[in-house]
């Protein structure tokens, strides 16, 4: 990630992805969102405990639809249901800059392959790939925009 990058973690839970990014990429700003107030509280407490000042923790509706991100890293909330998950991903991947990318860890048995197919259809100007598979999980990547063919 380039210095100054804006990174988004959707469904941050207690903050493992957001806080790891903030620790290893101190020149970046990480926005961690979750609908669960308790999860947000724990993420804030963990960020404070770690002395991180480059993390913002918020509810999704607290983030402007005009906000743009350079990267989205997430273990997305698969269990909320397919239609709700699709709405969440449509919004947040749609808020990536044209050069922005997304990386999502999804359980193979939770529909990683069908999600990759859906992402490719939903975002035809962005390449979608199964970057890596291990121990029942897939890392799905959504690349920067390219011209439509």
List where the protein language model places each region.
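Conserved beta-strand signature within the Rossmann-like core of class I S-adenosyl-L-methionine
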Residues: 99-107
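Short, glycine/charged-enriched secondary-structure capping and boundary segments
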Residues: 23, 45-48, 86-89, 117-120
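Short glycine-/acidic-enriched loop or helix-start segments at secondary-structure transitions
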Residues: 18-19, 83, 113-116
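A short glycine-rich, Lys/Arg-flanked "PGG" loop and its adjoining helix->strand segment in the class I
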Residues: 86-98
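Class I S-adenosyl-L-methionine
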Residues: 111-149
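Conserved SAM/SAH cofactor-binding pocket of Class I
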Residues: 1-65, 71-74
